[in-house]
Amino acid sequence: MSAGPDLGAVFDEHVASEFETQDIDATMRTMVDEPYVWHVPALTGASGGEAVRGFYTSQFIGHTPADAVLRPISRTVSSDRVVDEFVLEFTHDAEVPFMLPGVPPTGRKVRVPTVVVMGFEGQKIAYEHIYWDQATVLVQLGLLERGSLPVADADEAERLLELAGGEEPLPA
C-alpha cells in the first residue's frame, strides 16, 4: 500500500516559493492550471491561472515586508487538504496589498495568528483560503481603537505562541 503524495511537502515548497525565493513560476508549478487564492479578511485574491499569476505578481510575491516570519503553531494533513496555523510577524514598513490594500506603511510591528487551508487535486494545490483577524492587525497599526471594541492586539499572538510552545520562526 503506497502512502500517497506528501501534501505537507508540496505546501512547504509553495510557501518557500512565495516567501523565500519569491519565484512566481515555481509557485504556480505547485498549483493546478485553474486555482484560486482568497485572503478572506481583506477580500483579496484571484481565481483562474492567469488571474492568480497576476495577483501574485502585483499584490503578493515581492510585496511582503523583508522582516516577515512565520511562527508555526500546528499543521493538519488529510488526503486532499493541508491546514496550517501560524503567527505571522512583520514590520509594516512597506505597503502590503494582499493584507492591507490601500493602507500606507505605519512602521509598526504586527503579530497575527493566521490559518491557511490548502485544498489539493492530486499533488497540486487547487485553492488557498487564508484567514486572520483583521481588527487585530488594524489595532496594532494604530488604525482602530482597542478600548471600546472586543478586539485584541499582539497579545493574542503572544498567548497562542506560549500555549503552543513557541516554535522557532520560519523565514517568510
Question: What residue ranges belong to the model's regions?
Answer:
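C-terminal and inter-domain tail/linker signature
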Residues: 1-172
